């Protein structure tokens, strides 16, 4: 009798995706982050659902409702901090997942990559709106500053901002709609993630060498199921260490003060995972220019397939581009640091130099190094 998992319409889909899926035998731990992101998303949806049961999206009661969750709800503090720090884990996995894709040339799977870029934008939008919900000082002023950037759009800017606000400032209407969008977006992200997987399974996984691995495939289960479970356990260990011992380490103390439109915090800054983009935004003195640079800093990922000049896919055998890649990583860390610093003398110029080098490495130096490496390998006649 044929196995039910191979014949049943529903089980068949699961079987072809997670059990009998042929996978390259040499993929490293850098390929674990896809499954970790799936787990992160599930944790965020579940904890978020329980938080939504007790949260009220009204300017008068939002801050109090979050306090109520932490003090009065059974394990409310645990749910709240798992959700807040879960977002940080989500972004750590996301950045490592994208970094892996850049290093090993996974962006040559165009459809998968573009859905991935779309997912990145969706997750960033969700995280931004989620940060506004506790209605602390940094929530309010972060929302004000970031939404205000849209006013830089010529002609329709001001009208657009007032339309998003639902009034003439960030107020009750803004908070309510942000809660609505923050609730619905994770489900859209889940749907996009399924499409992401669908496109990936059309081509099969890439591998560290960047070479065709059709001759050497192994089944996903048990080899990669057990490997993924190990990754998940390690991630939960890190997450729960954060949640139980350092729950506020990645947060901002200003957000423990209720939102006050009459009092601006000394340094308005977003959560740590947006600091690199915030630094790029601030490094350009012109408002519209800054907004364009901010969007381009993420959208540049969509250009990666067109900037690939080498005849080799992966950076595994490309030492010059490898050096540039790690300089880019260091550069992003510098941008993250600068984003959290005040707008003062040494930081302004460091931020501007880091922003210039960020775009230069991706748009100019990496494509050139690809051509040079091909010449060195005499791949061109």
From Swiss-Prot:
Per the record, its GO cellular-component terms are: mitochondrial inner membrane; respiratory chain complex III
Which cofactor(s) does the record list? heme b
**Entry's cofactor comment:** Binds 2 heme b groups non-covalently.
List residues binding heme b b566. Answer: 97, 196
- Compartment list: Mitochondrion inner membrane
**Entry binding sites for a ubiquinone:** 201
For membrane topology, the record states: Multi-pass membrane protein
Q: What Gene3D superfamilies does this protein map onto?
A: Cytochrome Bc1 Complex, Chain C
UniProt GO MF annotations = metal ion binding; ubiquinol-cytochrome-c reductase activity
| Spans traversing the lipid bilayer | 33-53, 77-98, 113-133, 178-198, 226-246, 288-308, 320-340, 347-367
Coiled-coil positions: none
Source organism's superkingdom?
A: Eukaryota
Q: Sorted alphabetically, which keywords does the UniProt record give?
A: Electron transport, Heme, Iron, Membrane, Metal-binding, Mitochondrion, Mitochondrion inner membrane, Respiratory chain, Transmembrane, Transmembrane helix, Transport, Ubiquinone
What positions does the entry give for heme b b562 binding? 83, 182
One GO biological process term is: mitochondrial electron transport, ubiquinol to cytochrome c
Q: Which InterPro entries match?
A: Cyt_b/b6_C, Cyt_b/b6_C_sf, Cyt_b/b6_N, Cytb/b6-like_sf, Cytochrome_b, Cytochrome_b_C_euk/bac, Cytochrome_b_N_euk/bac, Di-haem_cyt_TM
State the function annotated in the UniProt record: Component of the ubiquinol-cytochrome c reductase complex (complex III or cytochrome b-c1 complex) that is part of the mitochondrial respiratory chain. The b-c1 complex mediates electron transfer from ubiquinol to cytochrome c. Contributes to the generation of a proton gradient across the mitochondrial membrane that is then used for ATP synthesis.
Q: How does it assemble?
A: The cytochrome bc1 complex contains 11 subunits: 3 respiratory subunits (MT-CYB, CYC1 and UQCRFS1), 2 core proteins (UQCRC1 and UQCRC2) and 6 low-molecular weight proteins (UQCRH/QCR6, UQCRB/QCR7, UQCRQ/QCR8, UQCR10/QCR9, UQCR11/QCR10 and a cleavage product of UQCRFS1). This cytochrome bc1 complex then forms a dimer.
What else the UniProt entry mentions is: Heme 1 (or BL or b562) is low-potential and absorbs at about 562 nm, and heme 2 (or BH or b566) is high-potential and absorbs at about 566 nm.
Family, per the entry? Belongs to the cytochrome b family.
What is the protein's name according to its record? Cytochrome b
Record the organism.
Mus poschiavinus (Tobacco mouse)
